[in-house]
């Protein structure tokens, strides 16, 4: 089971090659904050024209990233929402490997890392890690907004992340599965 989804996003061809062998299967637990994955996969069958995800978190969640430092953003003095990145998921995910796993999974399950738009925001008004997912396509459109409590031990991730891994393991052993 893969825990760090950003690694999958950085090496998708290697993952697909390894998974092409009969004895190899990759299982990725859903990141703690993810929702709408089944709807996205279903919409892709009908045809997705646009897909974006915004990951907005309190400034503390973005500390320690070299990319943020190169922007010159002072997270301790931030008094308004600040866009740290906006562009293709392929370009943004490597800059925030601990924070945007949800974008990596959704992009890989959806229309790919190049066509998925990612916006990363540090917002001092937030107390929750917020993910806004917007999908448009031939079957219609949907928006999913998730607001998760940050992990007390690691504000870069949701407090649901460890439960997500447990749910994935439980699902592997279950004879009945709902969704994905």
Predicted region positions:
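Rossmann-fold NAD(P)-binding glycine/threonine-rich loop
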Residues: 2-26
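Active-site-lining helix/loop region of Rossmann-like oxidoreductase modules
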Residues: 27-180
